[in-house]
Amino acid sequence: MNARASTAALSIEHVSVHFGGLVAISDMTFTVNEGELVSLIGPNGAGKTTLFKLITGAEQPDAGSIRTGDTVHLGYVDQSRDALEAGKNVWEEISGGVDVFRFGKHEVGTRAYVGAFNFRGPDQQKKVGQLSGGERNRVHLAKMLKDGGNVLLLDEPTNDLDVETLRALEDALENFAGCAVVISHDRFFLDRLATHILAFEGDSHVEWFEGNFEAYEQDKIRRLGEEATRPHRTTYRKLTR
């Protein structure tokens, strides 16, 4: 269903982003490899969505470089999930009106494919404009995966999901052949799936940590003390030239 990402799927090298005389991201460097799930954490406005825009090419850094592997196909689901046609039904939106998907040498009936995302029988005829947030999320995931994304960018993917769909999402990511970069505040999701944490800790500092969210929190307390784990306002360094 998806092409396998090359080993170095995504490389961020010495990336900096400035706005309004402030430094949003300073000299960020990390690499995402096949099989890894990297979670971006930090307060709203810290720079997580900006990083997604840099990866997709929607914005350019003020310094540094962003490279993807030769076989990488990005798949992106953003938090708004608004790029759907309200007048289409679920099957039409996902299938594009065709009866069969071809994944390499394999063929899959589109009705069966849509059903695998928990849209069965009459649910496939529901209009997109009438779907709940969780249902819209499932439609986006189905469209993204059928397009062959092997590096997934997911913005708050667990928002609005019922328990059954959340379990299905976790299982799919756990068995995913590529890699994923995920913005999430869901610590239980991150404890189960994250292999690395990229934490926007304030003062334009981003911490790269190998491990899940719980291990990162313990390391943060060791580095910065208990006070550092409490919610705080995002701060940025001033740009100096």
Model feature map: region roles:
Residues 1-16:
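ABC-family P-loop ATPase nucleotide-binding domain
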Residues 12-15, 23-33, 64:
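Conserved beta-strand
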Residues 38-39:
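Short beta-strand immediately N-terminal to the Walker A/P-loop
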Residues 32, 43-241:
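ABC ATP-binding cassette signature C-motif
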